UniProtKB/Swiss-Prot annotation:
Signal peptide per UniProt: 1-21
Organism: Mus musculus
Gene that encodes the chain: Angpt4
Keyword field: Angiogenesis, Coiled coil, Disulfide bond, Glycoprotein, Secreted, Signal
SUPFAM superfamilies linked to this entry: Fibrinogen C-terminal domain-like
Protein name as catalogued: Angiopoietin-4
Domain (Fibrinogen C-terminal): residue spans on this chain: 288-508
GO MF annotations in UniProt: receptor tyrosine kinase binding; transmembrane receptor protein tyrosine kinase activator activity; vascular endothelial growth factor receptor binding
Length: 509
């Protein structure tokens, strides 16, 4: 930038020098002068022509000029030429002097111009520096503002990232706290389960000890039964001899039966004669009307009785009458009750013989007896009705067609057809052909002896889905009892019921 004024000054000097050279150009000869000008880092070279000095032409030799006469003729002409040359030379010297003055004036003017340019150049340089500083300041301010904006943006981003990291940290702390609480809860549960396991282990050890004691007791009972068996065997031998004696006496009695028949014949004839005598008498003889005989409650219902209560029936091939409770109101009446549970007043943990003959009060809790039910169901097809009541007031009933009970030799096996009920479609009663079991007669098709484990006598098929003769549990104690009064598809396998009834009626009655 500092070289531009110098270049301008040197250009002006060049123009002046070229103008002077042009003024002297026509007179210039073959010689030239070289002038070099340097201004700062720039240099300039000027080539100026130098005028030649004109020399007189050499005088020819006299021989060439044709003798002395020709020289004498040409001498005035040479002098004339020299005079012109001197006049031209003086004129040229004057012009050179003028050009030098012009050059000196131009040089002074150029020096003044240089000084003016330097002064102006300083002001321009100061202004240029100020403009440059202002531009740089503006640029730096713009850069600073841009940097500030970028810094603010980065600060906002960092603040957002910091907030996000803080939120994630709080979330992780919350999750760790929840995990810690969950871990503490699991530890407490594991501790409680460990304590419960220890308690169960202690109870299991107690049960094992009790089981060992029971096994020892059962072994002692088996030994006692073995001794009793041997005693019975010896007694059986004694009874065999006694039976032989009785047989001999029976033959003797049969021989005497003929005489008894004769006496009976005579007695019959005497009675007939007595009847004829009484018939011939004038006084009338009142005869009692024979009392009607019923084989079940349905026949009593057909006779016109409509009140539920205890009645007497006479079953086939039975020598003594049987008292039964007749329900004359439920579903048309005529039902003969064979089982009733309502308050736990009767213990149903009985032997085979007791279940065979029956026990309890027929007006309340009782079991009619397997033998009576067998004789009752052997003469015709019967309908079995089972009624169930729970502790919440709900009740249901199930009916089975073609119910029949086998003989004692058949272990009072169960025979029923399909059921219809409000307790679900599935059947909780034992399947066809299941035998009756008690605590002293195991017919349950299981090594576990269900009658002893679940209590009572019932048709157990590998312990099965029902037992209406189990232990009677009162309210608030009836839950989680597998040895209670249960019917699986009514209230589940461990709910002990409030009351039950089982009753029979001939089909079609």
């Amino acid at each position: 930038m500092l070289c531009q004024p110098a270049m301008l000054l040197d250009g002006l000097l060049l123009l002046a020098t070229m103008a002077a050279a042009q003024h002297r150009g026509p007179e210039a000869g073959g010689h030239r002068q070289i002038h070099q000008v340097r201004r700062g880092q720039c240099s300039y070279t000027f080539v100026v022509p130098e005028p030649d000095i004109c020399q007189l032409a050499p005088t020819a030799a006299p021989e060439a000029l044709g003798g002395s006469n020709s020289l004498q003729r040409d001498l005035p002409a040479s002098r004339l030429h020299l005079t012109d040359w001197r006049a031209q030379r003086a004129q040229r010297a004057q012009r050179v002097s003028q050009l030098e003055k012009i050059l000196e004036n131009n040089t002074q003017w150029l020096l003044k111009l240089e000084q003016s340019i330097k002064v102006n150049l300083r002001s321009h340089l100061v202004q240029a520096q100020q403009d440059t500083i202002q531009n740089q300041t503006t640029t730096m301010l713009a850069l600073g503002a841009n940097l500030m904006n970028q810094t603010k943006a980065q600060t906002h981003k960092l603040t957002a990232v910091e907030a996000q990291v803080l939120n994630q940290t709080l979330h992780m702390k919350t999750q760790m706290l929840e995990n810690s609480l969950s871990t503490n809860k699991l530890e407490r549960q594991m501790l409680m389960q460990s304590r419960e396991l220890q308690r169960l282990q202690g109870r299991n050890r107690a049960l094992e000890t009790r089981l060992q004691a029971l096994e020892a007791q059962h072994q002692a009972q088996l030994n006692s039964l073995q001794e009793k068996r041997e005693q019975l065997h010896s007694l059986l031998g004694h009874q065999t001899g006694t039976l032989a004696n009785l047989k001999h006496n029976l033959h003797a009695l049969s021989s005497n039966s003929s005489s008894l028949q004769q006496q009976q014949q005579q007695l019959t004839e005497f009675v007939q004669r007595l009847v004829r005598i009484v018939a011939q008498d004038q006084h009338p003889v009142s005869l009692k009307t024979p009392k009607p005989v019923f084989q079940d409650c349905a026949e009593i219902k057909r006779s016109g009785v409509n009140t539920s209560g205890v009645y007497t029936i006479y079953e086939t091939n039975m020598t003594k009458p049987l008292k039964v409770f007749c329900d004359m109101e439920t579903d048309g009446g005529g039902w003969t009750l064979i089982q009733h549970r309502e308050d736990g007043s009767v213990n149903f943990q009985r032997t085979w013989e007791e279940y065979k003959e029956g026990f309890g009060n027929v007006a309340r809790e009782h079991w009619l007896g397997n033998e009576a039910v067998h004789r009752l169901t052997s003469r015709t097809a019967y309908l079995l009705r089972v009624e169930l009541h729970d502790w919440e007031g709900r009740q249901t009933s199930i009916q089975y067609e073609n119910f029949q009970l086998g003989s004692e030799r058949q272990r009072y096996s169960l025979s029923v057809n399909d059921s219809s009920s409000s307790a679900g479609r599935k059947n909780s009663l034992a399947p066809q052909g299941t035998k009756f079991s008690t605590k002293d007669m195991d017919n349950d098709n299981c090594m576990c002896k269900c009658a002893q484990m679940l209590s009572g006598g019932w048709w157990f098929d590998a312990c099965g889905l029902s037992n209406l003769n189990g232990i009677y549990y009162s309210v608030h104690q009836h839950l989680h009892k597998i040895n209670g009064i249960r019917w699986h598809y009514f209230r589940g396998p461990s709910y002990s019921l409030h009351g039950t009834r089982m009753m029979l009626r001939p089909m079609g009655a």
